[in-house]
Amino acid sequence: SGESGKSKITARARYGVSTIANDNDFGMANLEEYVQYQRDARINAGYNPDDPTSEYYFPQAMAGRRATNWMKELTRNGSLQEYELIASGGAGKTTYYTSLSYNKTNGIVPTVGFEKMQIRANLDTELNKWLKMGTRLHGGYMKVSDVQNSLLGDSGLAPTNPFYSGMALAPTMNAYNEDGSYNFDLPFVFNVNPIAAIREQDKYDKQYKFNGTVYLEWKPIKQLTFRTNNSIEYATTTSRAYSPAFVNTASYGASLNTAESQYRILTTSNTITYDDLFNDDHSLNVLIGQEANAYESSFLQGISYHVNQQRPYHSVGVSVEDQRVGDGLTEMAMVSFFGVAEYNYKGRYYVKGSIRTDGSSKFGPDKRWGTFWAASASWNIHNEDFMQDIKSVLNQLKLRYSYGVNGNDNIASYAHYGLYSDVVYNGITGQLPSQLQNRKLTWETNKTHNIGIDFRLFD
């Protein structure tokens, strides 16, 4: 949050241009050089480039036609815009901080770009000398536009890669026909016009995201703090990838792949902290707490082939073979209880211990809970009295050791369920086990020892 007092407003703006580092035109031959190279190659091989009946016909007149600079056709100067507005301040026991930002980037390849908008608001207020509360709100929008290299996967040899097509295509090859339509007689790039492929495709991802947190903190005495944090995070994403028929090498014509997904995370965290210093020598910090979170995500995806290129959207009137639909839902939850205690004496001797118990819905009903702990100790030798004479040289000397057991739940949400899949055998449909049930599936545990020495000289 901001500071109590006079409000402060800050505005920032930035604009930039990006270009391709191209000091020598990528070493590419111009039209005259290319024609001369082709003619010399034919002559050196014993052929006559001026014989119109020969398949090696390549007359000098080719140098007089209009040249195509494919690299310039496939790229552009990129641009960057950034704007930000910040307001902060406060009055009395209340402080605030708000910001609004916008970013837009146009890439050096046409149709490639990035757009992002964010808004943020923080508010803190002291209700009385024992109680304070606050909130953190954040909302955002993001759009990423790209070019899909669907012809050859993500290979660098895809026609939509301007650095490949710009160098593979000769300056004698036309980008457009005389009637203004795209020229597809381009065998070096699989007869796909890269200009058309980049401009006529449509690929983007849009995301709207919100994150909100509210906290309440109660401090009945100086050493004791009760705090609760409660938050929600929600995001929804829309994706679209359309490829015209001339981009796809398969027989399914124009294709469209769209998807919508969203996720939600609810979290509550509640802690009690005791922090005190006794007789100026003994420091003690104890924290106990509880945390719970619930996660849910879902998606819906549709894929269509032989899409109407005049109206490139899904249609319910097409055959089943031309459409694919899929959806999914994932849910998981975790509950944790934990405690941490730290003690140090005169900044010389430190001990720390922690323990936590976690329950995860990812595991089987018989083994969902796991208990993990850690302990550590360290000795700041340089703070001892016998080290004072050399403290100006040896600025730090610490011995430390720790041991801990931690858990890992990084598995799929439904790995402990028994699952069946459809199967056809000898013309008869049935089901076959595809995943065995495991009620005892549980946490992966890792034990770690650490021992070390920290020192610093002449600082």
What annotation goes with each model-predicted range?
Residues 1-12, 80-82, 101-103:
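A beta-strand signature from Gram-negative outer-membrane beta-barrel systems
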Residues 77-80, 108-110, 361-367:
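Solvent-exposed loop/turn segments connecting transmembrane beta-strands
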Residues 4-68, 108-114, 118-209, 229-335, ...:
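Surface-exposed loop/interface segments of Gram-negative outer-membrane beta-barrel transport/assembly proteins
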Residues 119-121, 228, 268-270, 335-341, ...:
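Extended, hydrophobic alpha-helical segments in both membrane/secreted and soluble proteins
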Residues 79-83, 333-337, 458:
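Conserved alpha/beta core surface patches that mediate binding of polyanionic ligands
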Residues 13, 100-106, 351-360:
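Transmembrane beta-strand segments that form the barrel wall of outer-membrane beta-barrel proteins
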Residues 24, 43, 73-77, 87-91, ...:
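Outer-membrane beta-barrel initiation region
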Residues 10, 86-88, 99, 122, ...:
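Outer-membrane beta-barrel architecture
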